[in-house]
Regions:
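Non-heme Fe(II)-dependent double-stranded beta-helix
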Residues: 1-18, 24-119, 125-128, 165, ...
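Short, solvent-exposed loop/turn segments at secondary-structure junctions
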Residues: 28-29, 107-110, 143, 157-158, ...
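Non-heme Fe(II)/2-oxoglutarate
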Residues: 45, 53-57, 206-284
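Histidine-centered active-site/metal-ligand motif
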Residues: 70-73, 120, 157, 202-203, ...
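Active-site region of the double-stranded beta-helix
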Residues: 98, 123-128, 139-149, 156-157
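A short beta-loop-beta micro-motif enriched in histidine and acidic residues
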Residues: 121-133, 187-188, 194, 218-219
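Short, conserved beta-strand element in jelly-roll/cupin
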Residues: 127-145, 193, 201, 226-230
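Double-stranded beta-helix
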Residues: 145-207
Length: 284
């Protein structure tokens, strides 16, 4: 067994046990720089064309107006290629299975002072038939407690329960609903502080959140991609009628293995859009 295989095996084992794992500095500094440059370009050049987007200006401060851009892989060949980054595929093919597809990407900007997101489970928003949903959260900046890193409750994926959701009025978090009535407390949570270039993998049933970026300057940027087994159907729809309910949404990108439903073809329905602080959301 080579070092690469051994690392990926260990990460996948932790993913199954704890519901998350961290591949520290999986991307090179050059890869991180390229993604940061591309994120800046998307905010400045593409925002005017995004559904619900504003026009970004030329100053760095203008980038801070955006919480996130959804589906950036449809705007950027680099972010499309990153869906199938070898370090991601190495772990997911061990944690999920040999055939893996992606249905969503999100570019989080999270400027200084911007809120976090309350406890939630991603599979509440993107349902699979086999509990295979997983995320690859790529840190484009060092993620710390101060600037709003992820927090997770290790092992909270194991019951396989999707806990109820409710609206909240906690100013620490954005408008997205929060999970509640689960048998864990904040004392069970741990921060996931990682250097730029690290990938945090987490299960779709894992309870996770992030807090406000409490720094006075600077971003906590992250590119977050969602994946699932290619064998599972994707009965997904998005709030507000953006995507109607469907038996199996085929707006996907295969990143590993073979597609057992290739005969259905591929569609292009989801449109990139800017996520504002006061709009409704799909998760991440």
């Amino acid at each position: 067994m080579n070092d690469t295989s051994g690392r990926a095996d260990a990460l996948a084992a932790q993913y199954r046990t704890d519901g998350y794992c961290v591949d520290r500095q999986a991307l090179t500094s050059a890869e991180v720089t390229a993604l940061v440059d591309e994120a800046t370009r998307l905010c400045r050049e593409e925002a005017a064309r995004l559904v619900g987007g504003d026009v970004a200006g030329d100053n760095a401060d203008d980038l801070g107006r955006f919480l996130a851009i959804h589906f950036p892989h449809k705007l950027s060949p680099l972010m499309l290629a990153t869906l199938a980054h070898p370090r991601i595929v190495d772990v997911l093919t061990r944690a999920i299975g040999p055939n893996v597809k992606s249905m969503q990407s999100m570019l989080f900007i999270k400027n200084a002072g911007k809120p976090g997101q309350a406890w939630h489970q991603d599979e509440d928003f993107i349902p699979t038939r086999d509990r295979s949903l997983g995320a690859a959260w790529i840190a484009l900046d060092d993620a710390t407690v101060d600037n709003g890193c992820l927090w997770v409750i290790p092992g909270s994926h194991r019951p396989g329960v999707l806990w109820p959701l409710r609206q909240h009025e906690n100013p620490e978090y954005d408008f997205a609903p929060e999970s509640f009535d689960f048998p864990y407390s904040d004392a069970d949570a741990i921060p996931v502080e990682v250097p730029a270039g690290s990938i945090v993998f987490f299960h779709g049933h894992l309870l996770h959140k992030s807090l406000r970026n409490r720094r006075t300057t600077g971003f906590r940027r992250a590119l977050v991609n969602h994946y699932m087994s290619a064998e599972s159907l994707l009965p997904w729809w998005r709030d507000g009628g953006a995507i109607a309910p469907t038996h199996d949404l085929r707006d996907i990108v295969m990143v590993a293995g073979t597609d057992p439903y290739a005969y259905k073809g591929i569609v292009d329905l989801n449109r990139p859009y800017v996520r504002a602080e006061s709009a409704r959301t799909t998760p991440a």
